[in-house]
């Protein structure tokens, strides 16, 4: 399984896509790169409310204080959006996640303008859930 790119490479790769069909395919590919989430983690405690598709996100803090995120979705494009969010929050502490404004990255990628309203709402629900969990850890 190929590793996920860092933030800058994500943005570069995204801007290299010729059109939105290519960008959607790239997002789906990123979702396919996510490590498999265990069956035990597919439980109501980890489900994200407010997403039309089913989304599970598991968050834990490692010994260095860095937040580790794992996730899954039953929809390919949404799983890719989970991967995008994880890339943007990669190697951050709980405090960093709470303080980090992720939306300018979405604007640079022109992502929110090209998502359906329900996917945009789901993306916001993911961000709120991650930030809320991070605030409880910090």
UniProtKB/Swiss-Prot annotation:
Cellular component terms (Gene Ontology): cytoplasm
UniProt subcellular location: Cytoplasm
Alphabetical keyword list:
Cytoplasm
What InterPro entries does the record tag this protein with?
Cysteine_desulfuration_SufE, Fe-S_metab-assoc_dom
> Which superkingdom heads the taxonomic lineage of this protein's source?
Bacteria
Q: Does the keyword Cytoplasm apply?
A: yes
Entries under HAMAP family matching the protein: SufE (MF_01832)
Quaternary state and interactors? Homodimer. Interacts with SufS.
The record's comment on protein family reads: Belongs to the SufE family.
Q: What is this protein called?
A: Cysteine desulfuration protein SufE
